[in-house]
Amino acid sequence: MTWSDILAEEKQKPYFKQILDFLACESAKGKVIFPTKENIFNAFKYTELDNLKVVILGQDPYHNYNQAHGLAFSVQKGVDIPPSLQNIYKELARSIPEFKTPNHGYLVDWAKQGVFLLNTTLTVEAHKANSHKDIGWETFTDTVINKISENKHNVVFMLWGSHARKKKVLIDSSRHLILESTHPSPLSAHRGFLGCNHFVDCNKYLIEKKDQKIDWNLLC
């Protein structure tokens, strides 16, 4: 099974057509939607299903200009690193001594290694957080999470915050490793995310199960 198989199947369903119709109507009204159309499915472009090792769930895309490009928590180069990603870097630096904090938030090199950076809602209206949360995207991304669980073995799922942790029911914990904590947002990072050791625990598991690991330092 490939992403193309999953996408082809879902695109035939009424809910998916409703999503596309909604986006077309909003654009026709002059509303600005992030990420741009060609970047909406970048998580699937950069992380092939065959190569997928880790899933990190976000909620919805960044809603300011030049930020969102289809990968959860990632921003385009030349843009300030958002606070949640700053805390992700802090946890990496705390738990992995050799980690060098990048001067950007462009996470494509993680994605290419098999870190699937999936927002549960794939679009947002400019400057309106969660504005597209009820248009049907979660039906699609829930299906994606479930397909990963059913068709892969030994994937590490990182579920940060209450929204992501609700997706635990879609994952077979006998086949995969589920790591949970608070969200890396400044509002909650100090209540469990900082100190969670997820990146270390992830690599221990991948080495044990696959003799592979993620090079978290590989952010060119």
Swiss-Prot record:
PROSITE patterns: U_DNA_GLYCOSYLASE. SMART domains: UDG (SM00986), UreE_C (SM00987). Transmembrane segments: none annotated. The active site is at D60. GO terms for cellular component: cytoplasm. Keywords: Cytoplasm, DNA damage, DNA repair, Hydrolase. Its main location: cytoplasm. It is found in: Cytoplasm. It is an enzyme of class 3 (hydrolase). The keyword DNA damage applies. Its EC number is 3.2.2.27. InterPro entries: UDG_fam1, Ura-DNA_Glyclase_AS, Uracil-DNA_glycosylase-like, Uracil-DNA_glycosylase-like_sf. It holds the Pfam family UDG. One of its GO terms (molecular function) is uracil DNA N-glycosylase activity. Belongs to the uracil-DNA glycosylase (UDG) superfamily. UNG family. Excises uracil residues from the DNA which can arise as a result of misincorporation of dUMP residues by DNA polymerase or due to deamination of cytosine. HAMAP family: UDG. This is Uracil-DNA glycosylase. The lineage of its organism: Bacteria, Pseudomonadati, Pseudomonadota, Gammaproteobacteria, Thiotrichales. The gene is ung.
